[in-house]
């Protein structure tokens, strides 16, 4: 299982342009299966970008907790499925209510979308 984060604005823009968007109640997910050359040459299989807006919550502690929850969810989903061998990139943008929702419900929703579209 090899997951790395998107590092700069250029990488985020590439995934936004190449990816397909899915709008859910608690998050927006952008998945790109066709990756540019810079990603294909990498040793990592999964590229993850997380955008947590200050509009979501003013406190940095809460925003960081949301990021930790998302990273943990992705680790669970990628390790439990056939996604280990597939190279793909995704961006997750949480919406209002993300921090209050049950972890198992988030896991179910996110894994259903990812597994269906990869």
From Swiss-Prot:
InterPro entries for the chain: Ribosomal_Su5_D2-typ_SF (IPR020568), Ribsml_uS5_D2-typ_fold_subgr (IPR014721), RNase_P (IPR000100), RNase_P_CS (IPR020539)
Signal peptide location: none
PROSITE patterns: RIBONUCLEASE_P
GO cellular component: ribonuclease P complex
EC code: 3.1.26.5
An individual GO BP term: tRNA 5'-leader removal
Oligomeric form and interacting partners: Consists of a catalytic RNA component (M1 or rnpB) and a protein subunit.
Protein name, UniProt field: Ribonuclease P protein component
Function, as annotated: RNaseP catalyzes the removal of the 5'-leader sequence from pre-tRNA to produce the mature 5'-terminus. It can also cleave other RNA substrates such as 4.5S RNA. The protein component plays an auxiliary but essential role in vivo by binding to the 5'-leader sequence and broadening the substrate specificity of the ribozyme.
Keyword Nuclease: yes
GO molecular function: 3'-tRNA processing endoribonuclease activity; ribonuclease P activity; tRNA binding
Reactions it catalyzes: Endonucleolytic cleavage of RNA, removing 5'-extranucleotides from tRNA precursor
Native species: Rickettsia felis (strain ATCC VR-1525 / URRWXCal2)
Cysteine pairs bridged by disulfides in the record: none
Assigned keywords, A-Z: Endonuclease, Hydrolase, Nuclease, RNA-binding, tRNA processing
Family statement drawn from the similarity comment of this UniProt entry: Belongs to the RnpA family.
């Amino acid at each position: 299982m090899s997951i790395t984060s998107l590092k700069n604005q250029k990488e985020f823009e590439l995934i936004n342009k190449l990816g397909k968007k899915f709008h859910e109640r608690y998050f927006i997910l952008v998945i790109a299966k066709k990756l540019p050359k810079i990603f294909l040459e990498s040793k990592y299989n999964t590229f993850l970008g997380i955008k947590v807006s200050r509009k979501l919550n003013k406190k940095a502690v809460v925003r960081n907790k949301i990021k930790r929850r998302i990273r943990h969810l992705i680790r669970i989903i990628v390790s439990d499925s056939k996604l280990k061998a597939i190279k793909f990139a995704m961006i997750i943008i949480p919406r209002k209510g993300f921090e209050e929702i049950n972890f198992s419900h988030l896991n179910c929703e996110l894994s259903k979308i990812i597994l269906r579209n990869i």
